[in-house]
Swiss-Prot record:
Source species of the chain: Burkholderia lata (strain ATCC 17760 / DSM 23089 / LMG 22485 / NCIMB 9086 / R18194 / 383)
Lineage, top ranks: Bacteria, Pseudomonadati, Pseudomonadota, Betaproteobacteria, Burkholderiales
UniProt-annotated location(s): Cell inner membrane
Protein name as catalogued: Arabinose import ATP-binding protein AraG 1
Reaction equations catalysed: L-arabinose(out) + ATP + H2O = L-arabinose(in) + ADP + phosphate + H(+)
Domain ABC transporter positions: 5-240, 251-497
This protein's encoding gene: araG1
Amino acid sequence: MSAALRFDNIGKVFPGVRALDGISFDVHAGEVHGLMGENGAGKSTLLKILGGEYQPDAGSVLVDGQPVQFASAAASIAAGIAVIHQELQYVPDLTVAENLLLGRLPNAFGWVRKREAKRYVRERLAAMGVDLDPDAKLGRLSIAQRQMVEICKALMRNARVIALDEPTSSLSHRETEVLFKLVDDLRAQGRALIYISHRMDEIYRLCNACTIFRDGRKIASHESLADVPRERLVAEMVGREISDIYHYAPRALGDVRFAAEGIDGPALREPASFSVRAGEIVGFFGLVGAGRSELMRLVYGADHRRAGVLTLDGARIDVKRTGDAIRHGIVLCPEDRKEEGIIAIASVAENINISCRRHSLRAGLFINRKAESETADRFIQRLKIKTPNRRQKIRFLSGGNQQKAILSRWLAEPDLKVVILDEPTRGIDVGAKHEIYDVIYRLAERGCAIVMVSSELPEVLGVSDRIVVMREGRIAGELPREQANEHAVLSLALPQTSAVEAA
């Protein structure tokens, strides 16, 4: 039986980088084929070829045994291919219904039949078990909700071949379970699926087969994962053994470096207070909508704070906007790195140096390009940022390498005191996570107070000295590392009725 989808010796070269080199594997109807590899291994590039965004420089793609070459995304869609990229593609000023039906809204004599469109969307969303308001504007939804819209858009096209790139990176547990059911249903219907994820649990839960990429090459293909240990997949991905991804080691902690008292804002149900000692890593955990990111934005001055007092090294500080926070040595690495973290049109060097340009000025007027280049090269080497050179536009880097560049930006700051990391390893492979944890530990050893917001409970348990748990817009409790385990943390994070049931 011929494969529903075949990649035959695919090659793709960008200036200075061989992104794909001789990639070949099959995906069969009724199969979920996992695709794993470090950031920059070529997984997303392959999906962009499948989706018509890139053209291969070598090899061919076959659908149902027939060679195809998609000159555009529209051609790929017309051939029954649906690709859900990690970078969300939506129109923020349009509604959920309008985004889902973009380009195919029902009309009569040039007029869009909005009532019919909304009814159709509502029925399809209900059938998929997705709770979204068809009238809501996309730009006002959370990242998780926008991601569900993107997934639903692809599924509503009834594609024969569906590729999903890190689809659960922003989803809650409930939304993830909805997605898993959709994937299982699509497999039962005979669709062919490619599933990219760095989360081992998802790969073993969903995938019949799995292919591993490293540095643009296929390292291995497994027709079944039943007898393949996780350690083997990790070693194939990164080319080395990683026995303990978190490699936590206790540190000597100093006095309270940063404290927030009575912080209040629209997203919080009651005022919140917390503190962090010098050299301490405090993990913030909670379900989607718990208010963790919103609290951090209030502390950082990104959103208006109705009340609250901030102290740094025992002295009260006034933070009304982000510039105030940065002047006091407080920085935030945001949850949505593409929208708020990077300057996509700028180079890697410019993104690394943007926060410390005041230290790179010559005569107070001109940027010292030599110092800027030396700083960028130092951190590219130190953090193993995969880029052809420092002049490469950062938008062409993988998510993990973009995140390393953002972290480099703050490592270059000489007066850093407080670092707030919001989902620092979202969508990042196991090898890059290992390196980012090294950066976090390095910052803590410098005496920085670290706040790490994460939706990955194993990460919070593995990295943190202390864990603060939020639930429904308030701080539900905190646990020292010695008392923290999955049951204790989830008992605080879940709504009280669910917590009783879970126990």
